[in-house]
Design a protein with these regions (language model features):
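Active-site neighborhoods and metal-handling regions in enzymes and metal-associated proteins
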Residues: 1-183
Length: 183
């Protein structure tokens, strides 16, 4: 439901309704190292047409962002790939209007996708390592581990189809950079 639109919702006291989504952001530790995943699940067992559309946009953005994960890229590069596919999908769903490039330049997507695409993983689930060195984004190298977690969060608002109201979808996986790409 609407609580899926709240990043890191913690009250966990709402009743699950059959037409709503459950967003589960979970982590585990092994040998003092953290992991972090997120899944979005329809309570009824099946997405409605609006939920399915948003889920498919997020899944495409995540798939393409993961394909871009390789040595020499940066987390900013990965984020930009996710932003492109999120924005493209929001335009196709008629949630955003206008040209792709303009929506990206004007950051119109941020109303629905307000966080970065990922974060470092290590001894903490949000490892405090820097994203830049001397003002330059850190290039990915084999052995680095981070998350790829695009999402879309749509609260009630005028101007878009009511079927999209209160839909929050995020899909998060942990990525290891290898010599030739990622796993």
């Amino acid at each position: 439901g609407k609580n899926a639109c709240v990043l890191h919702y913690t009250k966990n006291n709402a009743i699950l309704r059959s037409n709503s989504l459950l967003l589960v952001d979970a982590a585990a530790e092994y040998d003092n190292y953290a992991s972090d995943i997120t899944r979005t699940i329809p309570i009824s067992g099946k997405f409605n047409e609006f939920q399915k559309k948003i889920y498919e946009i997020v899944l495409k953005a995540q798939t393409m962002a993961i394909k871009a994960c390789k040595p020499g890229k940066t987390l900013i590069d990965i984020h930009n790939v996710a932003v492109k596919y999120i924005t493209k999908g929001l335009i196709e769903a008629k949630i955003l209007t206008g040209k792709l490039e303009r929506n990206i330049k004007e950051e119109k997507y941020k109303k629905y996708y307000m966080h970065n695409t990922g974060h470092w993983l290590g001894l903490d689930v949000h490892d405090p390592s820097s994203y830049s060195n001397n003002g330059k984004p850190i290039k990915l190298k084999p052995g680095m581990i981070f998350t790829v977690e695009p999402g879309i969060y749509i609260n009630k608002e005028t101007g878009i189809d009511k079927g999209f109201h209160n839909i929050g979808v995020r899909i998060e996986d942990d990525i290891l950079i290898t010599d030739s790409g990622c796993e």
